[in-house]
Structures are given as structure tokens and as C-alpha cells.
From Swiss-Prot:
Protein name stated in the entry: Monomethylamine corrinoid protein 2
SUPFAM superfamilies recorded: Cobalamin (vitamin B12)-binding domain, Methionine synthase domain
Pathway: One-carbon metabolism; methanogenesis from methylamine
Positions annotated to bind methylcob(III)alamin: 106
Length: 217
């Protein structure tokens, strides 16, 4: 199989919730010498994007998302140790506080981004899913004075709206200027980021790591 064929099969395995197939193909891709980052960005992530789009359009429902997420997680169990091996050592990149917005429990994109940030030298503080804005502000306050980036994700438009409230709270608490804010997820656009006064968004996990490194310079 060519690399392109492997990527297409991986994408299809995610979309069809084929957990065993996803694991097998991920291992085959590694054995073929494909870099873990390419397996994620060209094979797995496109599958999750399709699933996210289908969910937004009400073509599929939560059980299918959970099964696709399980396929993705199973692949990441194989890939994370490989990503760790290529981790950037000795660079003081900063602290990434990662979380999924209140009312949202979709953590697959969040976990991917968290993994990629860690692999790129960030210290990670993962607050998990369905996180209240006040908890994010509290953690940001604890680390005032450090190099900090907040990285929040939301799969649903309803939970995305909470990002504006978070930005307002950070400004009220005089924390906004001391940190960077990046948000992602299917409904998040550059226009939205500009509207709420955040710093950046990214198309996928690998891009998120690059963007985060760039804005933390």
C-alpha cells in the first residue's frame, strides 16, 4: 500500500468506527516508516473532522462519535509513546492549560492537542472536559507571572459561546494580558477568535502545536 492508501484507510476506519482496523492500520503505518505526526494529521484527524461535521449536521449521533473516538484513542495509545520519543527537550516553551468547554464532553480533539503540545515541549495542565470558566480563571490566576497559554476546545456551537464569557472574565480579573488564549473545535473560526479577542485557532492538533509555539515566542 502507498502512504496515501494507508491514510485513506485510516480515515475510513475512523468514520466507520472500526476500532480493530484502526489499530492494525496505525501499526502498519508505523512499520512502514510513516512519521506519527503524519499518521495523525493525514489519516486519523481527517476522519474525526468528517465525524464532527456529520454530528453538527445531525447525520450521526453521540454513540457513533463515541465509537469513532474510541478508534482514535486506540490509535493514539500506539502513537503517543512514539511522539514522546521525538519530544523537544530542554526548551522552556511554557505551560499549556488545556480544557474542554463547560457543557461539552467531546474530548478526542482535546486529548490530541494536549498530546501534541506535550510532544512540543509544553508543560501540560489538563483540566479535562466540561470545565467551568471560573475554574479556568482560577488556574490562570495561580500561574500568573509564568509563560501560560490557555487551550480550550468545543465541538458544539453552544459550548463555543462560553469562550466569549471566559475572555470577558479574564479581562475582568486583569489576567488577559499575562497569557495567550487559543481555542479550537469544529465551530470555531478565525472570525470568532477575533470577535472575542483571543489570540489564535488552528485547523488540527499538529497545527495547534505549531501555532502555540509561534504565539508563545
Amino acid at each position: 500500500m502507498t502512504n496515501t492508501e494507508i491514510f485513506e484507510k485510516l480515515t475510513n476506519a475512523i468514520v466507520t468506527q472500526n476500532i480493530a482496523g484502526c489499530v492494525q492500520l496505525t501499526q502498519e503505518a508505523l512499520d512502514a516508516g510513516i512519521p506519527p505526526i503524519d499518521i495523525i494529521t493525514k489519516g486519523l484527524s481527517p476522519g474525526m473532522k468528517i465525524i464532527g461535521d456529520k454530528f453538527e449536521a445531525a447525520e450521526i449521533f453521540l454513540p457513533q462519535i463515541m465509537m469513532s473516538a474510541k478508534a482514535m484513542s486506540s490509535a493514539m495509545e500506539i502513537l503517543t509513546p512514539e511522539l514522546e520519543k521525538s519530544k523537544v527537550e530542554g526548551e522552556e516553551t511554557g505551560l499549556a492549560i488545556t480544557f474542554v468547554a463547560e457543557g461539552d464532553i467531546h474530548d478526542i480533539g482535546h486529548r490530541l492537542v494536549t498530546t501534541m503540545l506535550g510532544a512540543n515541549g509544553f508543560e501540560i495542565l489538563d483540566l479535562g472536559v466540561d470545565v467551568l470558566n471560573e475554574n479556568v480563571v482560577e488556574e490562570a490566576a495561580k500561574h500568573k507571572g509564568q509563560k501560560v497559554i490557555l487551550v480550550g476546545s468545543a465541538l458544539m456551537t453552544t459550548s463555543m459561546l462560553g469562550q466569549k464569557d471566559l475572555m470577558d472574565r479574564l479581562r475582568e480579573e486583569k489576567l488577559r494580558d499575562s497569557l495567550k488564549c487559543m481555542f479550537g473545535g469544529a465551530p470555531v473560526s478565525s472570525k470568532w477568535i477575533e470577535e472575542i479577542g483571543a489570540d489564535a485557532t488552528a485547523e488540527n492538533a499538529a497545527e495547534a502545536a505549531k501555532v502555540a509555539l509561534n504565539i508563545m515566542k
